[in-house]
Amino acid sequence: MPVRIPDNLPAAGILESENIFVMSETRAANQDIRPMRVLILNLMPNKIETETQLLRLLGNTPLQVGVDLLRIHDKESKHTSVDHMNTFYRDFEDIRNNNYDGLIITGAPLGQIDFKDVVYWDHIREIIDWSQQHVTSVLFLCWAAHAGLYHLYDLHRQLLANKRSGVFNHRRTSDPHPLLRGFDDEFFAPHSRFAEMDIEQIRQHPDLEVLAESDEAGAYIVLSRDNHNVFVMGHPEYQKDTLNEEYVRDVGEGLNPDIPQNYYRQDDPTQDTIVRWHSHGSLLVSNWLNYYVYQLTPYDLSDMNAKTPWESKK
């Protein structure tokens, strides 16, 4: 089934060229189907690139998905035009009374800044709090995963001596679980961050469960025991060249970055990159959307209330 996107969104042409099924709002409005409503809070600098990456994953699921793009209103984007933001993005005040099937909160290049020093931290906290009552399931990615664990569970991250960048091997750490259905025992995923959460601190928290981890990269997938919040410490949405583009950028800025691990052939930046995470990244988002959103969300979103669908089934 297609991902349903606003008419004329730039990502549409890219996705169609990759044979990913997308549908305009105009065409979808003529179908008698209740699409999943997913809100994306896009905190990444290059909005269009991140939109495309996430829509690519959502478009590979068997469900029709309608997407709203959300911005932090008083945070002007330096890398995306004002026209694009005003045309395709909504402010929180516009949607605060809405309910959604799912919410995705992206990463952000804020890994070395204390959460309380982030200029829009109060807005992030407000949206996270709102999501606990107005969204069936929330998917936090990379920086957002750290932010969510800090705000909701008072877990603190530790800064790394060097940026952790690369593609790392992970293993499942739980019994068969819907979020990992179809996963191999071991799989790869990209990471790009300056901090990490102490995996033992997560394990000891009574409201959290570690589903996948890496010897090199630590905790990867963490689930709240009420199944409402999914925290992914890496970037399953990254495309083939994303880590390379970040590396080249950092070299150009004189930051002397480490070469992304397990990414270039023979660990040589002059050679091609090796993609070995796309299938599991796609499966992760598909499982989340199916088992944690579609199977649990009310048909009429106005029926959503303070009790989550998971609690209603107890």
Curated annotation (Swiss-Prot):
What is this enzyme's EC?
Answer: 2.3.1.46
Subcellular location as annotated: Cytoplasm
Keyword terms:
Acyltransferase, Amino-acid biosynthesis, Cytoplasm, Methionine biosynthesis, Transferase
Key word Acyltransferase present in the record? Answer: yes
Which family does the UniProt entry place this protein in?
Belongs to the MetA family.
Q: What is this protein called?
A: Homoserine O-succinyltransferase
- Which InterPro entries does the annotation name? Class_I_gatase-like, HST_MetA, MetA_family
Q: Which organism is it from?
A: Shewanella frigidimarina (strain NCIMB 400)
Name the GO terms of the biological process aspect. Answer: L-methionine biosynthetic process from homoserine via O-succinyl-L-homoserine and cystathionine
Q: Where does substrate bind?
A: 163, 192, 249
Q: Which Gene3D superfamilies match?
A: 3.40.50.880
General function of this protein: Transfers a succinyl group from succinyl-CoA to L-homoserine, forming succinyl-L-homoserine.
